[in-house]
From Swiss-Prot:
It comes from Rattus norvegicus. PANTHER family: CDP-DIACYLGLYCEROL--INOSITOL 3-PHOSPHATIDYLTRANSFERASE (PTHR15362:SF4), PHOSPHATIDYLINOSITOL SYNTHASE (PTHR15362). It is found in: Endoplasmic reticulum membrane; Cell membrane. One of its GO terms (molecular function) is carbohydrate binding. InterPro entries: CDP-OH_P_trans, CDP-OH_PTrfase_TM_dom, CDP_ALCOHOL_P_TRANSF_CS, CDP_diag_ino_3_P_euk. The lineage of its organism: Eukaryota, Metazoa, Chordata, Craniata, Vertebrata. The chain crosses the membrane at residues 6-26, 28-48, 74-94, 96-116, 140-160, 175-195. Mg(2+) 1 binds at D47, D50, D68. Catalytic activity is higher with Mg(2+). According to PubMed:7998949 the cofactor is Mn(2+), while Mg(2+) is much less effective. Detected in liver (at protein level). Widely expressed. Highly expressed in the brain and kidney; lower levels in heart, spleen, lung, liver, skeletal muscle and testis. This is CDP-diacylglycerol--inositol 3-phosphatidyltransferase.
Amino acid sequence: MPEENIFLFVPNLIGYARIVFAIISFYFMPCCPFTASSFYLLSGLLDAFDGHAARALNQGTRFGAMLDMLTDRCATMCLLVNLALLYPRATLLFQLSMSLDVASHWLHLHSSVVRGSESHKMIDLSGNPVLRIYYTSRPALFTLCAGNELFYCLLYLFNFSEGPLVGSVGLFRMGLWITAPIALLKSIISVIHLVTAARNMAALDAADRAKKK
């Protein structure tokens, strides 16, 4: 039986398309906000499809999980870099957001791998109740991730326009009001990620040291 080419699995091909769309978005961000945001949101939307494809085709892989997470982190980070350029007074907040996002996911993934999980989304159900809901409820996970990305995307668009009026309020401004609490909640969950992962790593270190005594 011929060896399977993991790199050509359908979910991973979708992942490559996400990267291409994200790069196109970054290229247009300085000059063409609607083109840039369309490609950015398309890249994010495909994130939902690669997971469905992986489950439907039985093509879930460690490489695919890593590709998915890295694409998410890098795309968000690049958008935040652009936001820091557009809103220089808020640069520190964007820097903190980037640092928290990358650090929390990396440490959580690393602690999951060390503990023997195949993916950062496979958690011990006896662990933190907030993370348990976050990773076992697909609607909750989708709402928080999509709302967070939409908040930053709307903040980018808001720099250029308030959007079409809905009553007396611009659509982009209204969208920011709706998604801001979601983005804040996502940041709180990232802090929980970081603290929980740090405790897990410390517990593993303590167990290893106890074995050596």
